[in-house]
Amino acid sequence: AGQLAAQVTYRLDDEDRLDIIFSGVSTENTLFNPMTHVYFNLVGKDQDISQHKLQIASRKHLEVDNHMIPTGNMIDNQNTKFDFAHLHALGQEHYDDAWVLGLSRQGEGLKLTSPDESLTLTVDSDRNGVVVFTANPDDNSAIKTALAIEMQTLPDAVNHEDFGDIVLPANETKTYTVTYQIKKSEDK
């Protein structure tokens, strides 16, 4: 079965940038796709996030079957509910989906702002995907109060060759980094 030694390091700098660094080494070949499941609401606890504005450096998202398992197809985002190429409000849509991140994203894989844009969260990683999950209440009339942002190698990569490599070979170390930064606008 082997032994996996995993380490998580948190590093905060003077620019209010938080790096989370995941490292792993195993005595046998295994899978390694660590991520965080952190929820954000930039206007306050229990407040509606539908007017938060989102931008994702992505042109494609993963198609899933009726069990939420990726089919292997990457679908164009343009002119769909998945099109966050430009900053715009989340709206009432429910999300529990994976976006394929572009390679030239210049430190902003994802940007989330408060409705008045007084606060901006940027998230980036050396990973090729991001899962965005609106805390989808069972009651469709209930408000969504948080957004989870999970930077990771694309889900189900072990079954889809072009989704990325999550195999951790025996006695090799893999390291991944996710960076979060919140900025307050001086103009708002």
PLM ranges: what are they?
Residues 1-188:
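An exposed, glycine/acidic-rich loop-and-rim segment of catalytic or binding clefts
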